[in-house]
């Protein structure tokens, strides 16, 4: 099944895209698609505590963006703000735009069809099977009553197609009947990514998805996310401490520091010294040619 966005021209002459397996009226026009996420002088944090100041950056469809920064720099806070799980500290509406529209202006059901989130801390769902977890990604497309029914009945129609496709893409279909509690960390991570894919959103946000995984699983996960961004035209943003993997797989970097965000493609940020300056630590050397770090003994 071809799940890439299908282009068409609206009555106004704008190039638009249907979202696969979403209602036919749900489409995004090319002007909005150029910058799916826009931050402009965004301030993040909590009442009485500012964590991120003057944050400006963009993320486009078809790209994998890695958010890098030290512990306590505000990566998780920024992702939660992007996901509208906590409000920006700015009073200016255009400080955070999603497809050209202020995030605060989206209704909850609209937002659930625009972006999905894979957080480090997830609700307890160990008693559910893999298929049941992935099916929950379709709840934004159901009425309240049918949403509760769906927890106890098999998915049908477009919902079943979306669930199956998501599990095929993440290689979770072979163990779809297994309880989540029986899976490895890497398998569990793929299940929650499958749930995000089943949700059918153009944007996916992930908070440290490679944490607690062994190295082969980290590589496999980054390959999957890169593939989804490029072939499904998803806008994917992930935070990570696996810097070298991010340099190899990400299309763009957001370097989150005390003075804001430095953004760009890895090769450019390596060549102009931005990465070396950002990770400047005694005894740590960065090779811009190989995009690798070495430790001086």
Where in this protein do the model-derived segments appear?
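Catalytic Walker B motif of ABC-type/P-loop ATPase nucleotide-binding domains
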Residues: 204-207
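The feature captures the beta-strand-to-loop junction immediately N-terminal to the Walker
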Residues: 68-70
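Helix-to-loop junction immediately C-terminal to a conserved catalytic motif
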Residues: 83
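H-loop/switch region of ABC-family ATPase nucleotide-binding domains
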Residues: 240-241
């Amino acid at each position: 099944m071809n799940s890439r966005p299908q282009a068409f021209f609206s009555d106004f002459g704008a190039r638009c895209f249907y979202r696969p397996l979403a209602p036919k009226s749900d489409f995004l026009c090319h002007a909005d698609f150029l910058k799916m996420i826009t931050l402009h002088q965004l301030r993040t944090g909590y009442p009485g505590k500012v964590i991120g100041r003057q944050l400006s950056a963009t993320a486009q469809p078809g790209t994998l963006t890695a958010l890098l920064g030290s512990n306590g720099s505000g990566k998780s806070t920024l992702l939660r703000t992007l996901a509208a799980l906590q409000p920006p500290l700015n009073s200016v509406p255009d400080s955070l735009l999603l497809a050209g529209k202020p995030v605060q202006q989206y209704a909850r059901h609209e937002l659930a069809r625009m972006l999905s989130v894979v957080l480090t801390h997830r609700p307890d769902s160990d008693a559910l099977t893999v298929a049941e977890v992935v099916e929950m990604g379709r709840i934004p497309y159901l009425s309240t009553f049918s949403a509760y029914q769906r927890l106890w009945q098999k998915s049908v129609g477009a919902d079943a197609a979306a669930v199956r496709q998501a599990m095929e893409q993440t290689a979770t279909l072979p163990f779809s009947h297994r309880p989540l509690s029986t899976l490895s960390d890497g398998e569990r991570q793929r299940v929650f990514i499958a749930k995000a894919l089943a949700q059918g959103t153009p944007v996916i946000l992930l908070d440290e998805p490679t944490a607690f995984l062994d190295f082969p699983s980290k590589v496999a996960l980054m390959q999957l996310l890169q593939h989804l961004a490029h072939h499904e035209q998803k806008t994917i943003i992930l935070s990570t401490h696996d810097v070298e993997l991010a340099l190899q797989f990400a299309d763009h970097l957001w370097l989150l520091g005390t003075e804001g965000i430095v953004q760009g493609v890895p090769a450019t940020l390596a060549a102009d010294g931005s990465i070396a300056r950002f990770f400047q630590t005694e005894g740590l050397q960065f090779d811009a040619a190989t995009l690798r770090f070495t430790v001086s003994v």
